[in-house]
Amino acid sequence: MTFRKYFDCYDFYDRAKVGEKCTLDDWDLMKIPMKAMELKQKYGLDFKGEFIPTDKDMMEKLFKAGFEMLLECGIYCTDTHRIVKYTEDEIWDAINNVQKEFVLGTGRDAVNVRKRSVGDKAKPIVQGGPTGSPISEDVFMPVHMSYALEKEVDTIVNGVMTTVRGKAPIPKSPYEVLAAKTETRLIKNACAMAGRPGMGVOGPETSLSAQGNISADCAGGMTCTDSHEVSQLCELKIDLDAISVIAHYTANSDIIMDEQMPIFGGYAGGIEETTIVDVATHINAVLMSSASWHLDGPVHIRWGSTNTRETLMIAGWACATISEFTDILSGNQYYPCAGPCTEMCLLEASAQSITDTASGREILSGVASAKGVVTDKTTGMEARMMGEVARATAGVEISEVNVILDKLVALYEKNYASAPAGKTFQECYDVKTVTPTDEYMQVYDGARKKLEDLGLVF
């Protein structure tokens, strides 16, 4: 049976007003974990410790489980406390009509984002930047310039301005609007100073309200060739502010980057259960948000990292499955435990770059060092490693990738609780010349040597 019209954010808003009532606790503590557990058992999902899947039948079962999760659960609206349900036809229509490619940036700095596959020989797009990490106002430009100066980096992902004109960008205040506009203006100036004025950016990151996000589209700020962020909530939830942002993005013909970080050990539960939710979230991105691409980021509930053994498995299986059975374009964001200028930070980022590249990700986004929560602890050097490792991994046999990852993760996974704090950007770089210190170069070379010993060929 055909459907009356294509589903969009306006339909979502209308259904969020009349859908089935549900409490937040019932959603988080009953509906999500129970359905994920039920689907894991129904499809007999067992990843058997693999980072990147080699069992196509198991991948197909995972896709069916993720599809069913979205169909049967729907999406919870936190403002109306109602559930928005989709029909099976609406879900398939979104999957079958995704944006298959797009261009980020302009001129000679523009990059084409196209579908990759598991084991693809092409290097993914590297979106380098603080990835939502807090950055001091006085070094905001040089921090982002450190990424634009890296040739491995194709586009920039914004950091968060801790202040603007010395004031906190409080949500729904004039300072939030000013920060949302200033954030991208400063970054684009930094790119121009690095000789790459046409680089695309991804944001805004500072603003937390719809008015802030919408105001970032402005003269000298974000344009339709930049990635415009809207975030789903964990797990399979959204608020109406985000729906309003989507309405603006679609009406403005913006590239839409739908973001969400499924939590391993959280509401969904274990590895397979969280991956089911991750697949459902990917599909919801193109249905609810009309997303050009989905920015993933499975994160460990205890360690706050995306680079653990468990979260890498979730990321690898989710992306490989989405890549195998859909044309949805997918990225992943990086949150190591360790801080900059440490070998552990670089090895953590490398493990995720290997996983993402081999599993078919189109975009790698990072690195938010020190879990992305410490001011000024992120630099362009971590993105250089992310890019170099991606280049070295592209085209490597999946069986070999799984062996390398097992050995690599073992090098740092016992050190999460005592992860080295690392150094700030100001300690890692000459701020005036925006060049890394000799110390960081030596640390970088040491990490690179360990990766070569594991079998990567740079």
Swiss-Prot record:
Task: Identify the InterPro entries for this entry.
Answer: MtmB_MeTrfase, MtmB_sf
Q: GO molecular function of the protein, one example?
A: monomethylamine methyltransferase activity
Task: Report which reactions are catalysed by this protein.
Answer: Co(I)-[methylamine-specific corrinoid protein] + methylamine + H(+) = methyl-Co(III)-[methylamine-specific corrinoid protein] + NH4(+)
Pathway the protein acts in: One-carbon metabolism; methanogenesis from methylamine
Per the UniProt entry, what is one GO biological process? methanogenesis
The alphabetical list of record keywords is: Methanogenesis, Methyltransferase, Pyrrolysine, Transferase
This enzyme's EC code(s): 2.1.1.248
- Keyword Methyltransferase among record annotations: yes
The keyword Nucleotide-binding is annotated on this UniProt entry = no
Give the Pfam families listed for this entry: MtmB
Homology family? Belongs to the monomethylamine methyltransferase family.
> Assembly and partners?
Can form a complex with MtmC (MtmC1 or MtmC2).
Q: What does this protein do?
A: Catalyzes the transfer of the methyl group from monomethylamine to the corrinoid cofactor of MtmC (MtmC1 or MtmC2).
**Protein's name according to its UniProt entry:** Monomethylamine methyltransferase MtmB2
Taxonomic lineage is: Archaea, Methanobacteriati, Methanobacteriota, Stenosarchaea group, Methanomicrobia
